[in-house]
Amino acid sequence: FGFDFDTTMIRIGLMNMILHGIKKPHMTYLDSLSKQNEIKEEFTVILANPPFTGSIDKDDINDKFSLSTTKTELLFLELFFRQLQAGGRAAIVIPAGVLFGSSNAHKDIRKLLLEKGQVQAVISLPSGVFKPYSGVSTAIIVFTKGGNTENVWFYEMKSDGYSLDDKRDKIDGKGDIPDIINKFKTD
């Protein structure tokens, strides 16, 4: 399943799923944060790289959100948490500010994830990993819905296998990714 309100991204997403062997790809035209989102399904896995450092008009925000904010990066995290079934797992790309922000909404989303979920890992990504599209410092947060957090595995990725400038030239195409996978599996 996938949702987007950009038809070009929907076409790209569908083609990507087909190329990766998904027989019946499903993507829907939907602004996930808006009042039009009436998706009730709960998912076992959510992988997402939502748009961040944006905001949404307060009048357009779905009434189901408990966070008092218009910041999309926080609203998406709450949405993903809510749409996971108990025991479901998510890996979400977030701006690093989500981890350290001091607003009440930042504190509330961290409290939700830590106390009503199990945050397993925070993987800090190198600055420039999303260039030329974004220079925002980012991380991947991995969590499960349910329980509470006891230990969090942290990893500071130095390289994703590509140059961190605007050209993003291939270095080895792997960087720290094999090490992250190996260490995350064993921890």
Residue ranges and their predicted role:
Residues 1-4:
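Conserved SAM-binding motif I beta-strand of class I
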Residues 10-12:
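Short alpha-helix immediately C-terminal to the canonical SAM-binding loop
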Residues 17:
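Conserved hydrophobic residues forming the short capping helix/wall of the S-adenosyl-L-methionine
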Residues 22-32:
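Conserved SAM-binding strand-loop segment of SAM-dependent methyltransferases
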Residues 36-187:
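A conserved structural/catalytic subdomain of Rossmann-like adenosyl-cofactor enzymes
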